[in-house]
Amino acid sequence: MKRLAITIATLLFGAATLSAQQVLPLYEGVAPGSEDRTDTEQVTYNQTTGEIERISSTSSPSITVYLPSPDKATGKAVILCSGGAMMFHSWGNDVVNMARWLNERGVAAIGLKYRLKPMTPPQPRPQGAQPRQQGAQPRQQGGQMPPMMLNLDITQFDQLVKSNADPAANDAEGVRLNMQAVDDARVAMRLVRSHAEEWNIDPEKVGFLGFSAGGGVAIGATVTATTPEEMPSFLATIYGPSLMEVEVPESEVPLFIATRAEHRNVAAGVMSLFMDWKRAGQSAEMHIYADPQGAFGPDDTGLPSGSWRESFFRWLNYTIE
């Protein structure tokens, strides 16, 4: 009976969260540069809660707003940039779960659905072709491997140039798509601040929290911001290195990083980012955990990385009063 009560309460809370959402498009009409997109967005829902679990083939970017109850609101807001290797949004873990956690602590959460790679149906394997071995690393034309495929460990972070980890410079399509996602994040920052009074948000307390590829998008939006309205008040990246060359902004933007030491390339990339920030005289905090590589799940409480959210929240309150 107790378990049933907990389950019902969880479902009711999830339903309340969904009913309280606002979804706003970032652009009027088609997003600039996506005029030729013909793919259809795909959405997967959690069969238990009915909440969105995963999104792919996004070409119409938007923000989804999750606001805390007015009696808890602190005025702080976090724009959540989910991970998924630019192929999908890990919306359930990186947005829905994180938004609920932040709302409970009085922080507004805004899920950013930035543009992704178009997903095409898998092509049939040519007759006689050998299956690709598990763990084999893809190569670009010409046989050269992109930086993220060099399999660097954290001790080799100095081999990364200005934190640029992925995509490779000669991956024109990857660079173009990354810039579209970065543009989406900059527009999202402006849009959130334009609604600050309506949503009970302090426009000076709005920042990014990105996961994996979403961390790269958040970093890109920060280092390419051209106006005060686009510059975040803080930047946090969770196992997400930069996807472009980094020129640390002159504006003060405190940086928070969390990753796992054995998450090869990623750990090296974010350490390089940390050093860039410190060399520029900026505030930066980094947590590198010893447990196995991969994403931080919601049930990691028994692992060293299970404390990352509390560390982020303490850092946020210390940095943004």
Task: Give the ranges of each region predicted by the language model.
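N-terminal cap/lid segment of alpha/beta-hydrolase-fold proteins
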Residues: 21-72, 104, 179
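Short beta-strand element of the alpha/beta-hydrolase
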Residues: 74-83
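Active-site glycine-rich loops that stabilize anionic/oxyanionic intermediates
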Residues: 82-87, 261-262
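Short amphipathic alpha-helix adjacent to the substrate-entry channel of hydrolases
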Residues: 92-111, 275
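Gly/Ser-rich "nucleophile elbow"/oxyanion-hole loop immediately N-terminal to the catalytic nucleophile
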Residues: 130-133, 137-208
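Primarily recognizes the serine-hydrolase "nucleophile elbow" in alpha/beta-hydrolase
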Residues: 176-252
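The feature captures the conserved acid-bearing segment of alpha/beta-hydrolase catalytic domains
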Residues: 230-288
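C-terminal catalytic histidine-bearing segment of alpha/beta-hydrolase fold enzymes
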Residues: 283-321
